[in-house]
Amino acid sequence: MKELASNKEWKKWGESDPLFGVASWNNKNKDGSNPWTNEDFYQLGESDWRDFRTHWERYGLSSNDSCLEIGCGAGRITKQLALYFKEVHAVDVSEKMIEYAKTHVTSSSVSFHVSTGVNIPLNDQSVNSVFSTHVFQHLDTLDIARNYFKEISRVLKRNGTMMIHLPIYKWPSSSRGFKQLYAIRKQLSDVRASMRRSLMEFGLGKPIMRGLWYPVDFFYEEFPKLGFDDIEISMFVTKSNNDPHPFVLARKG
């Protein structure tokens, strides 16, 4: 099978600048005026996980026995998952990212796995929880995403829950004005990404990951087919950078 374009892009970040690839804040690249230090990078993970965990527990995080993290990167959140869950399986398509994560996430409760970005290298019904942030927004297509959710359903135990961060449009219960602003933001983001990607073909500009947006109908149409129920879409602001983060949460029936 031909390697996914998103895999190739992510592997470049793993080779060139793992921390900035995960958290692309202004001037935080390794050659920037204020590059990430390991201390600051992993403290960011601690702050964000507190916000994520609060909303996951409010939804109904079913167990702290085991968790699959999809797209662990350099281990920003993995480090915190290891303090909460008894067993953590962290997967990523980049061997370089995993090598970096292993250096800084040394808990014996964590197992790292290199994945294809298509299949999850775990047995059926082997984890109680699944978490992912800033990963599904970079997948190639909705068909790839659909297959990945099918894989999540396969490895997730019954009554297990997932919390997945991804960009969503056509919000079900937001005002017309909010929907219009969100649609404009989406269009501008798509145009900017396309322009930057075109410049890269001529050796200009900085690398940029592709962006995939999810129509809200996708979850309500596809998830029940995969055995998920209690579907909830939530957006909240994280304290680390005051940015809104949309998540979809669901339970394996």
Mark where each language-model region is.
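Class I (Rossmann-like) S-adenosyl-L-methionine-dependent methyltransferase catalytic domain
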Residues: 1-60, 67, 74-81, 85, ...
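Flexible, active-site-proximal loop/turn residues at the rims of small-molecule/cofactor binding pockets
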Residues: 136, 140, 148, 168, ...
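A short glycine-rich, Lys/Arg-flanked "PGG" loop and its adjoining helix->strand segment in the class I
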Residues: 146-158
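Conserved acidic residues
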Residues: 65, 86, 128
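A short acidic, Gly/Pro-enriched loop at the edge of an enzyme's catalytic core
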Residues: 118-130
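A short SAM/SAH-binding and catalytic strip from SAM-dependent methyltransferases
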Residues: 129-143
